[in-house]
Amino acid sequence: MRSGLVSKVLLMFFVFFPGIENIAFSQLNPKEKRMAEKVMEDISPSSDLFRGWNYLGRMEVDSVAVDQDNERVEIYFSPHVVRIPVRHVWLNHLKYNIRNNLRRRFRDYSIEFYCNGRPMEDYIPLYYYNGVPDSLRMKSHSLRQPLAEKISEPDFPAGLSNNNIALWASHGYYYEAKLDRWEWQRARLFGTVEDIYPFMFTRNFLVPMLEDAGATVFLSRERDIQVNEVIVDNDRSTGDSELVVNDGNGQWIESDRTGFAPKDTLFPGENPFTSGAYLKMEVSREASGTLQYIPEIPEKGEYAVYISWGKEANALTNVPCIVNHSGGQTRFSLNQQMGYATWVYLGTFHFQAGRNPGRGSVTIVTPKNSIGVVSADAVRFGGGMGNVARRPAGAYIPRQWSLKDGQTDSHRVEIKDSVRYTYKLSGKPRWMEAGRYQLQYAGMPDSIVYSLNDNENDYNDDYQSRGEWVNYLMGRPNGPTGTGEEVEGLNIPVDLAFAFHTDAGTTPGDSVIGTLGIYSSERDDGMFPDGTSRLASRDLTDMIQSQIVSDVRLGFKADWTRRAMWDRQYSEAWRPNVPTMLLELLSHQNPADMKYGLDPRFQFAVARAIYKGMARFLAAREGRQVIIKPLPPDNMALEIVDGKKIKISWSPVKDPLEPSAVPSGYKVYQRIDNNGFDNGIYTTDTSLVIEVDEYETIYSFKVSALNEGGQSFPGETLAVSLNQNSDDPVLIVNGFDRVAPPAFADGNITGVAWWEDEGVPWHRDMSHVGRQYDYDRSSPWLDDDSPGNGASYADMEGKVIPGNNFDFVFCHGQAIRDAGYSFVSVSDEVFAKSDFNVTPYFAVDLIYGEERGTPALFNRQHKDYRVLTPGVQENLERFVSKGGNVLISGAYIGTDAVENNDTVAIGFAEAYLHYRWMTNHADNTGELMVTDKASALFMPSLSYNAGYHPHIYKVEAPDGIEPAGDGAFRIFRYTAGKVSAGVAYSGSYRSVALGFPFEAVPDKEERNKLMKDILKFFQRD
């Protein structure tokens, strides 16, 4: 043995240099060399160890060491091995295979694996780790005081209560100084653009999922899609908005420190939170007061509410705040020792138009029995329009890659006569703009957060600002890069950061690019400033990527591609001083990826997977239990039980992917007429009886499920209204459950087949930019203005596309109520049950909207969202046999049965509802006319929505239906093509079938007249 090795034989063999012997190996004596050769012969079949993963890079054994004294074999893998998820079961499998290949003398040796200088066990996330966890990746779950705690919400100890999460969705609209224009950072493809496409996932699904599990979520971009904005401030307020100051027993005074002041336009270097002042009060047991912020709301709708306060040394952590909205009153407790001098999100609430202090205000109350300082600055309602103006600076820095490795210094390019350029606003809603501009509006310091390039390149500023914003939220010792202990920041303890992107790239056929995860573990000796190991970022990346791939494979595509986990110094991965993942979910350029990516169900599944990954990561890091929150309840029904008493019932939904996602309770929310919902009533039962207060008032209800992990999204919204003068009520059956992607073609043409089916968004689609126009798969990318296959128009940018809001019972019910009838409602699943009692109803109103058979999750051969399912047919047959009347409306009430070759449903529609399908795409104008035969019974004309409307979905392919059987006759035709649009039947019962959705008639007066005519026809007068 050579001196220094003692009893350890080091045998090195570098597979990727087969012609070059390692120096240590070449220095071995002949006996040692023979031993080395025998050992390598034993493990040479290791090329099969990474079968199935080699597409992620070269993976093999780099070297081997044998410790004879301790009877241990150490195997060193090539660096790319850590691109794959590491688990104990996989390592044990590798050891088993290798041990079986070793000759007898090594069979009893232990085997250890290493990669990049670490034991392979170090790459197992804490959640999956068996043994003593790495303390440098752990974090105590301290009893934090939340930033803004909603008093009405329960605590979720096995969820995300008291966790703070910072995230951002992709890029955003930005100012390109070189071209002197505002533009997207990516190309418009397949009807969307990456700059706002991930925003759909976060805004619709991920952010509310995290918040409903108890987390406080911080966004670097504006979250609210409301284009109106109202500011109430002590300096200046919008319109007739007002700040009412009540000193009480104390005195509100203007602080000598700077605060917010509204400005219509922000120019470089301007900070709105240093442009004004704020109010404060020294609170004692004797001194107390209130501040009431009363906005003048320009139009009714949903508005995000933001509040702000100043920085005070003796700030209180329990400041009461009350939001009065159209649904009632919601109370908060504010921790003013953090989050000062910026916008703090309270929630999104419904407000009626105008000034209404009782139903539209925010009140700050000084807490009782407290000593300290309460401060208050501006309150903001709504997201608004972008107000940051840009023009070229005196010089321009070229774009830099986000990846730090290999970067060279950029050369400044002088821009002559820059003062001749005019300042330009984006002209877009603020939510569409890049985070750089929102961060300026939110009071972040420019030089260390959002303008690291001296206003000379907004593109670089934007991606660099995202991580520095996270650091500024936290402050020392985790402050912005290079500031060390100098910057106090906002004192918010952020637990993780998450960057949501999609990638580019194409593949042939139906193969997908798939999901990539990026983290950074190497900078600063692999440690965050607070002493946490940067391997925590790998844990987070592994947990989220693994969950996404697993759930997508089970629900959508069994061979969804899991790409690598890259350990690279991308700005968004390395800058945040907290565990961070940069996600590249799929390729927005690849047709096969976007076929799934445009599906709202896919978006929900991905967002839920991300939430689950985060929840498990944080629970493991904090050493506590995790429970996944339930899915929304279904099988909802309202029933009149006695007088004004209404029974609300529902059923829990089992999550096939999550055994812990079981409800332990429910919240029932109520809305009165067209106001917002209240804060809900908690119950552990699956039904609740309430007594409504007023007749001829519409009461709407929705239910969410809860457990210790969080609260689900609510299920559908049903409604009831009672009329003292009405006999048997109308039963509204909500059969419109569908959400679906647009049709997709991949043959001679490739892309979104919007002419066939534009799909149904979940509530809303804010990511649509315009229709695709390039369907040639061979078209190359030349420039973002000429991106090839998938290229799309820009005419719909900023327009929110309405989808299925699961609340169309209200629209139908409003017309029924105004016609003088009582009504009650149930889901179609409840109506389809064999024991459903159909006798107490005068008529059934079947809502089918854009319901249409769509491939189901988990079983793509089966179709969900079918019209006239067997159970519905059976109960309709029973109902009409007793003389009951039926209204059925929907765009596919004939098409669905025909395209699914459902001869039973076709026959039922003809025999009992007395219509037969003639054509789909019967019209594209939205205009209807009454037939001569029906002119004495129905209104002469009306319109449905066949184009864009901000409040109702587009009906792109209504059905043409013809009368079937004696007693049936046409009542409406589509004006343009004269195709039959509606059919009525008069016999032992009466029915009306409409080939367009009733709720798609946008004019309330026309809807009311149509419903009144139908119900009068049912009366048989």
Kindly label every feature range from the protein language model.
Residues 406-421, 432-534, 538, 566-589:
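Active-site microenvironments of hydrolase-like enzyme catalytic domains
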Residues 289-313:
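A short beta-strand element within beta-rich, extracytoplasmic domains
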Residues 270, 358-361, 367, 378, ...:
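Active-site-adjacent mobile loop/cap segments within catalytic or ligand-binding domains
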Residues 690-710:
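Beta-strand-rich modules
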Residues 617-660, 710-728:
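Pro/Thr/Ser/Gly-rich low-complexity, intrinsically disordered linker/stalk tracts
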Residues 850-957, 968, 975, 1006, ...:
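A glycine-rich, often tryptophan-bearing local segment used as a flexible ligand/cofactor-contacting loop or short
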Residues 190-194, 201-214, 221-222, 716-842, ...:
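Aromatic-Pro/Gly-enriched surface loop or interdomain linker
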Residues 730-736, 743-756, 799, 835-900, ...:
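Short alpha-beta junction capping motif
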